[in-house]
Amino acid sequence: MNKRLLIYPLLFSAGLLQARQKPNVVIIFTDDQGYQDLGCYDSPLIQTPSIDRMAKEGIKLTDFYVSSSVSSASRAGLLTGRLNTRNGVKGVFFPESEGMPAEEITLAEALKEQGYATGCFGKWHLGDLKGHLPTDQGFDYYYGIPYSNDMYIGPSQQFASNVTFREGYNLSKAKEDQEIVRTSSRADIKKRLNNASPLFEGDKIIEYPCDQSTTTRRYFDHAIDFIENNPEQPFFVYITPSMPHVPLFASEQFKGKSKRGLYGDVVEEIDWNVGRLLDYLDKKKLAENTLVIFASDNGPWLSFKEDGGSAEPLRGGKFSYYEGGVRVPCIIRWKGSIPTGVTSDAIIASIDLFPTIMHYAGCQSFKQKIDGINISSFLKNPSLRLRDEYVYVKGGEVHGIRKGDWVYLPKTGNSKFKKGDVPELFNLKQDIGESNNLHLQYPDKVKELQEVMKKYQSTSTMPYAQVRDTLNDDRQYWIQTLVKIADPVISNLSKDQLKKNIPVGRSSSALASSREFITHMEAVGRTIAGIAPWLELGPDNTPEGKLREKYIKMTCKALANSVNPKSNDYFNSTATRQILVNS
C-alpha cells in the first residue's frame, strides 16, 4: 500500500539551511533492561564504561518514560511519537500475529522522506507479516530477529536462497518446525522448538536457528557497515539488541566475566559494542554531527530473578505501571551541540524523540496527531522544564498519570487488577519506591489528577488495528485449526457458530492469557469478540470446565451479534470478564 507522509518542511531561510547540516541519528534501544542496570545509574555489580562515557559526554535523564511497560507497544510509541491510545498497538505481538497499522508513519519513513539512509538492526517486534516488517515501514535495510528472542519461526516466513542452517537443521526440518507452529498451542511450540528463533535480512530468514550468542556483536557490526556504506546521506541507525530479554546469551568473550551472572555478562557485552560504535563515530569525525540516544524499551522482567534486571530504587518492572515498569535509563550524546556531564530530572518521554529528531531534520509540522513534544530547547538548556505531566497507557487505555511529583494509579500499578485492589496515590519526591499510598489522605489531589486523566481519555482514538483485516480468504484454514487445537468443550460449542458467516481473524496477545488460543472474531470499534479460555479470571474454587463453558456460551451468543453494538448481546470484554470474576 502506498502511504503518503503528511509531513511539511520547515521554512528555513536559505542562509540557515546552508549553515546547518542535517544530523545523523543513532538510537540504541535495549530489551528489558532495568533502571539500575548501568554503572552511571548506580548498578553495584554491572560495569558499563562505554555508556557511562556517553553520560559524561552528554545528558543523563533520571525521569525518562517509555509509552508502555511491554515491548511492542513501547517500540510503537518511540517510532511514531504517538501514545498507544492512538497508534493501534496495545500489547505484545507474536509470530504472524497482527502488526502495527501500516498507516502509522514511523520515524524511519519521515526521515527517509528527508533524504536519510535508514537501517534497523535487531529486534523489531511491530509485525513480521508482509506490510509490517521494517522494510515496509521506512527502513532501507533490516537485519535481526523480528520479535522477542524467546519466540519461534512463523508458518509462512520465507527462507533466503543463501540461508544458513544450524544445529542439525536443513530446509525440510525447518519446514517441520513451521508446521508445528501452524498446528500446536503456544506452550507446546515453546517446549518443542526450545526458542529456535529465525534471523532475518530484509524480509527473509538467513539463519535458522539463530546463533544468539553472537547477535549483539553482529547487530553492531552491520550497523557500522551500514554507516560506512552510506557516506553521501545523513543516516538513521536504529539498533535494538535482543537482550537482556530472556533467554540470555553471551559470547565467549564475555561469558562469566561480570559480577552479576549471565545477565551482567549480556549487559556488559552490549556496553562494549556501544563503545565500538562511539569510537567509530569519533574516528570517522562523525560524532559532532551525530545524535546518539541510549534507552531501554521497558523495565526488567523481575520474575526471572537472577536472569532479570533491577529497577532499584523504583517499584515494579516489566508489565507493571509502577515507575520500575515505565521509567528507564536514557542518555543522549551529541558532541559540540548539547551540554556534557549533565544529569536532569526533567520529565521526558520516548514519544518526544520523534518530533525532536524531525525538528533537527528540518520538519516540525505533521497532519497526524503527535503526542510527543519537541525537546530541542531542553537539549540546549537542560534547566528547562517543558512538561510537568505524563500519562501512563496500558492496553490502549489511560491507566495513570504523573503530574509534578505526584503519581495517581486508579487501578493500581499491577499488571492485573485483583479484587481488593484500591486506587493509589504516591509522592515520588518523598517516596520514590511508591510504598506509601496517600489516596485517602489527599482527596483533593486525587480529584485534580482524575481531571487531568480525563483530558487524555477524551482524546483517545484507538483505531481498528489490533486485529488484522478480516481473513475471509483464510477462513477454512482457521476453522480447521480452531477445531483441531481447541478442546472438546470449545469445539462442540463452536460448530454451529462456525457455520455462520462471521469474518475470521486472529486474536491479539494483548487479550491473551498465558494459554495459547485461536479465536474467530469480529472487531467493532475498540471491542473484540472471541472464543478463549479466560481461566485465570475465575475464583479459585470455580471448576475450570464450568467457567470455560459459561464463558464460551456467552461469547458464542455474543459473537453472532457482535456486528451490532446496540444488541443486548453485544460483546464487551471488560464487562464479560467482570461477570466471570463475580460468578
Please provide the spans of the model-predicted regions.
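Membrane helical hairpin/interfacial module
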Residues: 512-583
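Amphipathic, non-transmembrane alpha-helical secondary structure
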Residues: 217-228, 275, 483, 487, ...
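N-terminal pre-domain segments of enzymes
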Residues: 163, 462-465
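Structural helix-adjacent loops and short alpha-helical linkers that scaffold large soluble proteins
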Residues: 282-286, 364-367, 472-476, 534-552
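Short amphipathic alpha-helical segments enriched in leucine
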Residues: 30, 55-59, 486, 490, ...
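Formylglycine-dependent sulfatase
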Residues: 2-6, 17-424, 428-455
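Low-complexity, Ser/Thr/Pro/Gly-enriched N-terminal "stalk/linker" regions
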Residues: 466-523, 553-558
